Structures are given as structure tokens and as C-alpha cells.
């Protein structure tokens, strides 16, 4: 993770020059995760800053309350439980390119640290045995996605969702949801040419994500428990922590990094982190990385 301290003269607007924006993009594509220390107390300026890198935003889960009268700024998941490593919404077509976290309050005791794992490094460390398995066998997720507005009807209706990997798509009127299977590989193309990243939703327990009804491999292949535990242990071996300070902003390449959270102590009731999800960035994918 690279730390960036913005010029204090920019604090009243956070408007970057073309060169300053280019420098941020170059660092982002190289490191994949950036920290902007003590960026601002203004939630409006915060969103304006993020908007300089965003073409569109992802529709975050309804379970996360809206913050600061901005539907794009949401709470992180509630509760004190540990959240295991994952790439945000990597189980569906709604996977954002960039995930942002902003610290409103780091909390009273420092518990609940955000953690991150570089999928490029994890993929590099996996043996050919595992690489061959994941390159040959895509994951199939069985999903039920809530629909924000009430839909009327009694039966399921066949539905068309125009995205590669979607099949068996139905509107479920009784559940007020969209149900479908989604086929996705565990590895992603990265912003660095010819480099792959292991970034997915394989390492979390299913009960932690209500939208996932089932998860397996398309051709019924399975990973045995020993191999699964090895990959999980390897991921956490290279996992690092973020020590939050008030007004810090983190920018994460969601197609490269997996993130999670340590358990929050029950007495730590003041921890307050919010998230914004850039669905599509407004700069070219891999636009600053050299072809090597």
C-alpha cells in the first residue's frame, strides 16, 4: 500500500490537476491500493474527489444503510464478527472496479482492522497444480438478489440479464427478487499486462453473504479440505492490516485485492467506516502499465 498526502492547498476543493490525477492513476495501477491520509472532514468534498475517478457506481447491498444523504456512501457491514477475505461482489455481474473505504472514526481501541491480500502475489505463490485447476474450472454461484421496488405477480418469470456467465435467470415475484446462476473464474485479468490475480468469493463462509444460495464448480469438480485450507492459510500469510486514522481514505483495486475485517471488540462501539463502490472507473484499464 502506498500512502499519499495531498497538497494542503487542495484541502478546500480536492480538485486535482491533470498531472496530479495521472500520478494517482499510475500509483493505483502499480500498487493496487492507496491511502490518502487525513484527506478531508467534508463528506461532500470526499465524494467529489472520488467522482474524479468514477464513471459509474455500483448499487451496494440494501442491508448497508445510506450515509450523509448520499445513496452512494454506505455503512460497511454491521456487527462485530470477522469478515473473511473476498473481492467485493465478485460473485455477480455487479462487481465494482474500485472499492473505497473512509474512516469517520477509527474506534476506541483499534480493533476491527481492515485487512487486504494482494491477489497478484497470491496467484504467483500458488503451485501449477492449483493454477491449472482454477484456470480450467470456473465457479458457479446460485444467487438471489433482492429487487428494491415491489413487483407484482404470483409465479416465477423467465428473465433476460445481458451479461456473460448468467444462466437460469428468473424473476421471483413471491420473494421480490431476481434469481440466477452466475459462472465466473476465480482469477481475474489485472491492470498489469499478462498478470493474473486470485480475487474471488471462495474464502468466505456462505452464510456471510445472503445473496449467495449455493457455490460450486461448473463441472462438479471439488477442492478437498486440505487444499482449501492450504490456499486459505497462504492468503492470510500474505495479508496485511490497515491501522485507521480519522479522515483516512483507502482506494482498492477490487479486481486485484481481496479485503476483509478483523473481529471488533464488543466495547468498541465508536468504530465508523463507510464505503463507496466505483463500478466503472473513468480511466482506461491498465492505461499506465507498460507491456512487458
Question: Where are the model-predicted features located?
Answer:
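TRNA-binding/sensing appendages of the translation machinery
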Residues: 25-37
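Active-site environment of non-heme Fe oxygenases that use a 2-His-1-carboxylate facial triad
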Residues: 1-16, 21-23, 68-72, 79-85, ...
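Glycine-rich nucleotide phosphate-binding loop and flanking beta-alpha elements
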Residues: 42, 91, 258
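Cytochrome P450 catalytic domain signature, combining two hallmark sequence patches
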Residues: 54-62, 131-133
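Glycine-rich loop at the start of a catalytic domain that most often binds anionic cofactors/ligands
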Residues: 43-56
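Short secondary-structure capping/junction motifs at helix and strand boundaries
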Residues: 33-34, 57-61, 108-113
Amino acid at each position: 500500500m502506498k500512502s499519499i498526502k495531498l497538497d494542503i492547498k487542495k484541502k478546500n476543493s480536492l480538485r486535482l490537476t491533470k498531472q496530479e490525477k495521472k500520478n494517482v492513476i499510475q500509483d493505483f495501477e502499480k500498487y493496487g491500493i492507496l491511502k490518502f491520509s487525513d484527506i478531508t472532514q467534508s463528506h461532500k468534498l470526499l465524494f467529489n474527489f472520488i467522482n474524479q475517478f468514477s464513471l459509474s457506481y455500483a448499487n451496494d447491498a440494501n442491508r448497508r444503510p445510506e450515509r450523509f444523504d448520499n445513496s452512494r456512501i454506505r455503512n460497511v457491514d454491521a456487527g462485530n464478527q470477522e469478515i473473511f477475505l473476498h473481492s467485493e461482489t465478485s460473485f455477480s455481474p455487479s462487481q465494482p472496479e474500485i472499492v473505497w473505504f473512509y474512516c469517520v472514526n477509527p474506534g476506541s481501541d483499534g480493533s476491527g482492522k481492515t485487512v487486504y491480500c494482494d491477489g497478484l502475489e497470491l496467484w504467483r505463490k500458488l503451485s501449477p497444480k492449483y493454477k491449472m485447476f482454477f484456470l480450467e474450472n470456473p465457479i458457479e454461484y446460485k444467487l438471489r438478489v433482492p429487487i428494491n421496488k415491489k413487483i407484482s405477480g404470483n409465479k416465477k418469470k423467465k428473465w433476460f440479464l445481458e451479461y456473460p456467465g448468467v444462466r437460469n435467470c428468473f424473476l421471483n415475484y413471491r420473494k421480490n427478487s431476481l434469481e440466477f446462476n452466475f459462472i465466473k473464474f476465480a482469477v481475474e485479468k489485472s491492470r498489469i499486462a499478462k498478470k493474473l490475480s486470485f480475487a474471488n468469493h471462495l474464502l468466505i463462509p456462505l452464510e456471510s453473504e445472503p445473496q449467495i444460495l449455493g457455490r460450486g464448480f461448473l463441472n462438479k469438480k471439488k477442492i478437498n479440505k486440505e487444499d482449501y485450507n492450504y490456499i486459505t492459510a497462504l492468503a492470510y500469510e500474505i495479508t496485511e492490516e490497515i491501522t485507521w486514522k480519522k479522515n483516512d481514505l483507502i482506494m482498492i483495486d477490487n479486481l486485484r485485492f481481496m479485503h476483509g475485517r478483523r473481529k471488533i471488540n464488543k466495547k468498541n462501539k465508536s468504530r465508523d467506516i463507510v464505503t463507496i463502490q466505483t463500478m466503472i472507473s473513468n480511466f482506461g484499464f491498465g492505461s499506465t502499465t507498460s507491456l512487458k
